[in-house]
Swiss-Prot record:
GO biological process terms on file: quorum sensing
Role description: Involved in the synthesis of autoinducer 2 (AI-2) which is secreted by bacteria and is used to communicate both the cell density and the metabolic potential of the environment. The regulation of gene expression in response to changes in cell density is called quorum sensing. Catalyzes the transformation of S-ribosylhomocysteine (RHC) to homocysteine (HC) and 4,5-dihydroxy-2,3-pentadione (DPD).
Gene Ontology molecular-function annotations: iron ion binding; S-ribosylhomocysteine lyase activity
Reaction(s) this enzyme catalyzes, per UniProt: S-(5-deoxy-D-ribos-5-yl)-L-homocysteine = (S)-4,5-dihydroxypentane-2,3-dione + L-homocysteine
Organism (species): Edwardsiella ictaluri (strain 93-146)
Family affiliation: Belongs to the LuxS family.
Taxonomic lineage: Bacteria, Pseudomonadati, Pseudomonadota, Gammaproteobacteria, Enterobacterales
Binding site for Fe cation: H54, H58, C128
EC assignment: 4.4.1.21
InterPro entries named in the record: LuxS_sf, Metalloenz_LuxS/M16, S-ribosylhomocysteinase
Protein name: S-ribosylhomocysteine lyase
Keyword annotations: Autoinducer synthesis, Iron, Lyase, Metal-binding, Quorum sensing
Broadest EC class assigned to this enzyme: lyase
Amino acid sequence: MPLLDSFTVDHTRMAAPAVRIAKNMTTPHGDQITVFDLRFCRPNNAILPERGIHTLEHLFAGFMRDHLNGDGVEIIDISPMGCRTGFYMSLIGTPDEARVAAAWKAAMEDVLRVSDQRSIPELNEFQCGTYSMHSLEEAHQIARQILASGIGINHNDTLALSAEQLTHLHP
């Protein structure tokens, strides 16, 4: 099984909240695709609560598009990580980490302005696979924590596992 890019970085050294360029690629038609690791929690130290991350998934996707789309950037998808420590965001374009961090900050401010659970987009049985598993209060707690902590940048070159480490971990 091939080793995925996300597993070639040392999760014990990741800062959070922080933005990291997880992958850059070019499509056969020449489009630049960038995948960002939006790390909300330090791996193996904390996780996002399931109801809060689910509510955030519904809100974050729209708010990030409001603040980041345009000027050569279009978000394809924002999805929560299975480990519940953040989100992956795939997009067309190559915005730098500072631009993404600014959009993330603005999106968290937007989350805090949502005052009623009924305002959560697609919160119904027809458009959501687990529509009863939401918490606006948990989403607010997550947003407040991100804003209070500030959003940094994780760099692949400082997080890269060495070839020796990878060989030891995956003999």
